[in-house]
């Protein structure tokens, strides 16, 4: 899922996997989507009026990559969507078939409320408005949200700790032209080797030459989502870079955001955020 500062995405923990992964899976049964959204997507972290804030930074990173025109195609898969949609607001103009995913049914249900425009759905309009502002295409936020809803074709379970993260059902078209993943892998991995293995697993869903847009927490060890206090594997910028290279990517861009003191609100111990744009290397024959 996505977190906020961003805690996490619960993509993936099979109770039949190793003990560390099983422990993570059990902890996530207490995850509360609305508490997570309040902690990370309502003010102060959800205040988009300050361009130096974490929210504008993440949205700007995504918009700038798509503005290059180098990331497009037919099929996009969002890995560990959590209860959030902001990570797809720039992407939806460039892909006609989008799959959202999460390990937790409660997060998939939360996404469904927004996608179906049901009463009580979380209000993402401030984020949609901000993306329209920075993209400057003359598009209204209502048009932006309509397009995203129309292009999300399915919301599926996922387990990034399995060699086939989406299973063998064939419900999502594969391989994807692009992957997005925000605050997922570090949040659902008990240690660095599991994080690297999860990245390798999701990379199998991506075509050679395809792009990964990857956002996550730097040097974070825990975060809160209601009564749940969830462990995170702390990663550094260099460890993220090394994991991408080991999974067969060329790193096109890797940048970091240092969390300012006024946004360290006690809901986690995150030190910063990373954003990576990486391209899966095509094997030469």
UniProtKB/Swiss-Prot annotation:
Keyword Ligase carried by entry: no
Mechanisms controlling activity: Inhibited by 3-methyl-l,2,3,4-tetrahydro[1]benzothieno[3,2-c]pyridine hydrochloride.
This protein's record includes keyword Methyltransferase: yes
Positions with a binding annotation for octopamine: 220, 268
Residues involved in S-adenosyl-L-methionine binding: 36, 41, 80-81, 86, 102, 107, 159-160, 182
First-tier enzyme category under EC: transferase
Job of this protein: Catalyzes the transmethylation of nonepinephrine (noradrenaline) to form epinephrine (adrenaline), using S-adenosyl-L-methionine as the methyl donor. Other substrates include phenylethanolamine, octopamine and normetanephrine.
Protein name: Phenylethanolamine N-methyltransferase
Organism from which the protein derives: Rattus norvegicus (Rat)
